[in-house]
């Protein structure tokens, strides 16, 4: 498939924004459970603002993928059958909850609303945090299922697509939370850094499983089945047209297989071992710069990973354009 940069930035920015928001809520839940010291409300408010800006940037990137942006609102009409429509509906809900969560913390609306059990007092920020967490997880699923639900693109049609979007997005968000904490000198950098490492390693396991699965795929369609010829050796000599077309532009990435393999190595290094090593090194030497570097290195790797994700999908129609695709 053709990797559109608008969709690459959409998915990576949304993932980082959702992940950062989940990191803020996780930190608050740990503080409520007294596993972490309580933080100033402004800490969560600023973190939520950054998460909201990432979500807005991702939404803005999506408009560059539309032929008629003024009709974007119609994308929500098919919510009963379309994961894209569901994403269009869930995204503004997530953005509204992130905004409300940040505002509630900024104005310190922390008076208890009700009590659960003997000790847990639920205030507005905690309630919004839980609702936002549920919505964010739903958004991860909706975004990933846009691709995982496409049956004829066998590289995508697997639950591993959903796990990749979830864990890689969460890892980048927690890595950003560690960078944010390091930048302002907050001691939670260790907490967020540790969670970022855990999520990164889980994401590595998921991505490697996805790559291994795709390497063993047996495609249902071949040249023989496409044209109804049983001969063992069928080779296309020409695509039947003298120039390119929509089919050759939109359903093929136009790069060599060797480039894909090199990029795969690059993103596997940038997304996984380097950030983990940088976080570990920051613990040893007490550097506040290394978590920040770790986030930017990982995010750059995620852009390459997402490009490769789209490029790896082999559309069956390319059987008719083998001299190009």
UniProtKB/Swiss-Prot annotation:
InterPro entries the record matches: DmsC (IPR007059)
Main location per the UniProt record: membrane
Subcellular location: Cell inner membrane
Topology class, membrane: Multi-pass membrane protein
A cellular-component GO term for this protein: dimethyl sulfoxide reductase complex
Signal peptide: none
Transmembrane feature ranges: 5-25, 43-63, 87-107, 126-146, 165-185, 186-206, 266-286, 290-310
Family assignment from sequence similarity: Belongs to the DmsC family.
Protein name, per record: Sulfite dehydrogenase subunit C
Species of the source: Allochromatium vinosum (strain ATCC 17899 / DSM 180 / NBRC 103801 / NCIMB 10441 / D) (Chromatium vinosum)
Gene: soeC
